[in-house]
From Swiss-Prot:
Function comment: Located at the top of the head of the 30S subunit, it contacts several helices of the 16S rRNA. In the 70S ribosome it contacts the 23S rRNA (bridge B1a) and protein L5 of the 50S subunit (bridge B1b), connecting the 2 subunits; these bridges are implicated in subunit movement. Contacts the tRNAs in the A and P-sites.
Chain intervals for the UniProt region annotation (Disordered): 94-118
GO molecular-function term, one example from the UniProt record: structural constituent of ribosome
UniProt source species: Shewanella oneidensis (strain ATCC 700550 / JCM 31522 / CIP 106686 / LMG 19005 / NCIMB 14063 / MR-1)
Identification of the protein by name: Small ribosomal subunit protein uS13
NCBIfam families: uS13_bact (TIGR03631)
Pfam families to which the protein is assigned, alphabetical: Ribosomal_S13
UniProt record, GO biological process: translation
Gene symbol of the encoding locus: rpsM
Amino acid sequence: MARIAGINIPDQKHTVIALTAIFGIGRTRARAICAATSIAETAKIKELSEAQIDTLREEVAKYLVEGDLRREISMNIKRLMDLGCYRGLRHRRSLPLRGQRTKTNARTRKGPRKPIKK
């Protein structure tokens, strides 16, 4: 198994699909990485040479992925909460942020129903 950005990449999959195992790299970015490194998208990871894997590592290192990306996302949410803006308040109350209705839906975000105590 090749190790890129601290993640074990699956050997049996095509390069584009295998790169999506890294948090922060989707299909589009994986295709861009393959194009930049001139590695065929359909080539499997086990078929790549060590030099090609190194070029993949260097190209992935240019992007914000895995722990750094998770940290930045959580810091952005924390900043919104500290500002006290509408989105920050919605995060704090665990409610939907983008204007969805909450009277009947939003069960995923709100969690299980809490019974009314009598």
